[in-house]
């Protein structure tokens, strides 16, 4: 098993997409990259904590390659947008990757380079020290599945899930 920590907009969308992929064993929403201990969602949303909304993606590389996990990441968010994704604005929505070691850092750098093939422009995705991870509140975990009629999810997460299902069909879990 391998674990990647990735931030790219609202963690509800990242969580929703990664849960559709075969080989992904767990997805945990949380906060990382800031200076406040044990931040709350409300505090992170102010931007004052320095934390990003992020996900820990735990996956089996024998089922889904690490490069695919990372290519999905760059397919489902726009890495050219600094401190925002769509209407979500603030440093908590930054595009960032938090490597556990030098090998992951190299994988992440290679993925950022590949992102240039997907998007016209330069990625502003940062590679940041892993630091301390804080799980988000329980109601944020698997939010999309627990709140299927929620307006934000229907407007933002559903198109991302559909895009990844189409682009990475061979890795999507059987229904």
From Swiss-Prot:
UniProt keyword list: Oxidoreductase
GO BP annotations listed: protein modification process
Active site feature: 10
Entries under SUPFAM superfamilies matching the protein: Peptide methionine sulfoxide reductase
GO molecular function: L-methionine:thioredoxin-disulfide S-oxidoreductase activity; peptide-methionine (S)-S-oxide reductase activity
Matching InterPro entries: Met_Sox_Rdtase_MsrA_dom (IPR002569), Met_Sox_Rdtase_MsrA_sf (IPR036509)
Database matches in Pfam families: PMSR
Protein's UniProt keywords contain Cytoplasm: no
Catalytic activity: L-methionyl-[protein] + [thioredoxin]-disulfide + H2O = L-methionyl-(S)-S-oxide-[protein] + [thioredoxin]-dithiol; [thioredoxin]-disulfide + L-methionine + H2O = L-methionine (S)-S-oxide + [thioredoxin]-dithiol
EC number, UniProt record: 1.8.4.11
Family stated for the protein in its record: Belongs to the MsrA Met sulfoxide reductase family.
Task of the protein: Has an important function as a repair enzyme for proteins that have been inactivated by oxidation. Catalyzes the reversible oxidation-reduction of methionine sulfoxide in proteins to methionine.
Protein name, as recorded: Peptide methionine sulfoxide reductase MsrA
Organism for this UniProt entry: Clavibacter michiganensis subsp. michiganensis (strain NCPPB 382)
């Amino acid at each position: 098993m391998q674990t990647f920590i990735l931030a790219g907009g609202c963690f509800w969308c990242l969580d929703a997409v990664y849960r559709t992929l075969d080989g992904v064993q767990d997805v945990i929403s949380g906060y990382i990259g800031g200076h406040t201990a044990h931040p709350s969602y409300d505090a992170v949303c102010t931007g004052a904590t320095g934390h990003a909304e992020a996900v820990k993606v735990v996956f089996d590389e024998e089922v889904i390659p690490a490069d695919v996990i990372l290519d999905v990441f760059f397919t489902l968010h726009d890495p050219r947008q600094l401190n925002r994704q769509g209407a979500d604005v603030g440093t908590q929505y930054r595009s960032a990757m938090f490597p556990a070691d030098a090998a992951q850092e190299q994988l992440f750098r290679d993925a950022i380079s590949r992102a240039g093939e997907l998007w016209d422009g330069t990625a502003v995705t940062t590679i940041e020290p892993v630091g301390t991870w804080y799980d988000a509140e329980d109601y944020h975990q698997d939010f999309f599945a627990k709140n299927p009629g929620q307006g934000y999810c229907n407007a933002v997460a559903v198109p991302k899930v559909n895009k990844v299902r189409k682009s990475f069909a061979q890795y999507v879990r059987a229904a």
